[in-house]
């Protein structure tokens, strides 16, 4: 189900709680909402649809991916980026890394581990910042 975009900065600034099996419906809603906004958005976190859970969805080079409880476990090659957000107006500068190794759970709650680079890595870092309550 496509949900309304949350623009409440106080809510967005809260650190997300771990996602559980009961949150799989939220994961699907997040993906549905991202697809509905794909012309102007490449990634979303659950707090952007008003749910304070550690779930992200993003465009992974044309194939959409949902991550539950994502954690960056390694990062390299820092750089400065300028990013916008569907939940906030304007753009902001952020420190990012060209390569990140992420551990997460898929929709079957299986643990996954993968290295992402470039634009996809930047998207993931932005969405994980949302999970941490960091406004970008």
Q: Whereabouts are the PLM-identified features?
A:
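Positively charged
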Residues: 1-136
